[in-house]
Design a protein with these regions (language model features):
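Bacterial N-terminal signal peptides
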Residues: 8-19
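Conserved hydrophobic positions within beta-strands
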Residues: 41-43
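Short coil-to-beta-strand transition motifs
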Residues: 31-39
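OB-fold/S1-family single-stranded nucleic acid-binding modules
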Residues: 102-126
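Short, structured beta-strand/loop micro-motifs enriched in basic residues and often containing a Trp
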Residues: 73-81
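Short aromatic-glycine-enriched beta-strand elements
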Residues: 49-60
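Short nucleic-acid-contacting surface segments enriched for D/E, G, S/T with interspersed K/R
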Residues: 81-96
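Sec/Tat signal peptide C-region and signal peptidase I cleavage site
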Residues: 20-24
């Protein structure tokens, strides 16, 4: 009986330790969760795969310089349930994105809230924000 308790305690401790990196991976600490930014962008890439969908797009700054962005969405299974497909976006598409900006303004990695396609269709990301 004593060995069973020790084994169960060790198993529980191991599960807690193993789950910590997963929990850290899903943090939103890099993003300003109190701000929403909208941008008109041109899609340069779209990766519809696990663990998170990635949008790559370009914008221009006030001087006309091209800025390259990486935008993290939620997982493909969730997006599929709300209307996204791997063909939703393709390079060259011009859309509007709504994102949570990075806390560091020099980093062009943002968190997706939703997109508005050229035809006006709105697709949410449904990130747990």
């Amino acid at each position: 009986m004593r060995h069973t308790r020790i084994a169960l305690l060790a198993l529980a401790a191991g599960l807690v330790i193993i789950s910590l990196p997963v929990s850290a991976h899903h943090g939103n600490a890099a993003y300003d969760m109190d701000k929403t930014v909208s941008m008109k962008v041109t899609i340069t890439g779209f990766e519809f795969g696990n663990p998170h969908v990635q949008l790559f797009f370009d914008t221009k700054d006030d001087q006309g310089n091209v800025l390259h962005w990486n935008c993290e969405g939620t997982n493909p299974a969730m997006l599929t349930r709300i209307g996204w497909t791997r063909n939703t976006l393709k390079p060259g598409d011009q859309i509007t994105v709504f994102v949570r900006p990075n806390k560091n303004p020099d980093i062009t990695v943002v968190l997706l809230i939703k997109v508005v396609l050229a035809n006006g269709q709105v697709l949410e990301s449904r990130n747990p924000v």
